[in-house]
């Protein structure tokens, strides 16, 4: 995907480049990836931009609020105000809007979410699950890094479920 396609509302790109992936974690960046630098409670993602660039990031999309000094490295830097709120839409675009190709059932509440999502995914054909125990086919789950995955991870998981031929995802 081209960076301009990913960020269709940004018209000040110096160069339009091909991108191979997205990452919020500088340690997970691979060559051709875009590093997404969000403002955190203790650190800004830009604090880790140089590490991401050293691993092959070709662009950095960052939240300008609290950004501080941008490292002087000759790659594409794109400031996006309200980036955290736009992350889901950006990730969905990158992964081809996977939820548009799936029936996604969200399960909320205090108790029983894991049981309900697992039973639902096991009972229905061509189903997957995203939840506390992991994501994927109910009998072959891939562990998640966090109990509640971030918007980027959710879109990646939904895209993988779609690519596996799943029609339904039960999500805690």
Language-model features: locations:
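Short, mixed-charge, low-aromatic patches
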Residues: 6-7, 44-49, 77, 110-119, ...
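Phosphate-binding loop of NTP-binding sites
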Residues: 86-171
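N-terminal leader/targeting and accessory segments in enzymes
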Residues: 1-89
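Short beta-strand segments at enzyme active-site cores
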Residues: 60-63, 168-172
């Amino acid at each position: 995907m081209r960076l301009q396609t990913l960020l269709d509302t940004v018209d000040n790109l110096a160069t339009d480049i091909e991108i191979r992936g997205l990452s919020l974690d500088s340690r997970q960046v691979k060559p051709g990836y875009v590093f997404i630098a969000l403002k955190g409670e203790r650190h800004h993602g830009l604090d880790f931009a140089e590490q991401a660039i050293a691993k092959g990031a070709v662009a950095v999309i960052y939240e300008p609020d609290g950004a501080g000094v941008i490292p002087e490295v000759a790659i594409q830097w794109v400031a996006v105000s309200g980036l955290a709120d736009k992350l889901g839409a950006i990730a969905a675009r990158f992964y081809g809007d996977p939820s548009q190709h799936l029936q996604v059932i969200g399960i909320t509440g205090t108790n029983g979410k894991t049981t309900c999502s697992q039973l639902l995914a096991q009972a229905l054909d061509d189903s997957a699950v995203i939840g506390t125990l992991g994501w994927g086919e109910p009998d072959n789950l891939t562990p998640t890094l966090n109990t509640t995955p971030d918007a980027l991870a959710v879109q990646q998981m939904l895209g993988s479920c779609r690519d596996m031929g799943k029609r339904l995802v039960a999500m805690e």
